[in-house]
Amino acid sequence: MASILNTLRFLEKTSFYNCNDSITKEKIKIKHKGMSFVFYKPKHSTVVKYLSGGGIYHDDLVVLGKVTINDLKMMLFYMDLSYHGVTSSGVIYKLGSSIDRLSLNRTIVTKVNNYDDTFFDDDD
């Protein structure tokens, strides 16, 4: 149980690049600092659903599994030197740069509003 956390701490200091196979092969459920984690490799379709719902369309990230913080369930991933969570409705949270100090303090807005402004005419 502690080994997955030690692995993540090591990767935070070195690099998450090309580490998908070194994180976990089976589901590991742990509680850490008041948060519930399930470390595993989700199905590709699940990853696409969550990331596209949040407006993330690149693959320069590492999906780690699920996290629940304050009753909010999210898919957990590491991107841009920080841990992030994305909810099933597409809300993205930047959780922090250390597995030991994650919080819901920062929401990231990635979606562009979907207003259809075709009815506005430029009369200039």
Curated annotation (Swiss-Prot):
Pfam families: Pox_A31. InterPro entries: Poxvirus_A31. It comes from the Viruses. Belongs to the orthopoxvirus OPG159 protein family. This is Protein OPG159.
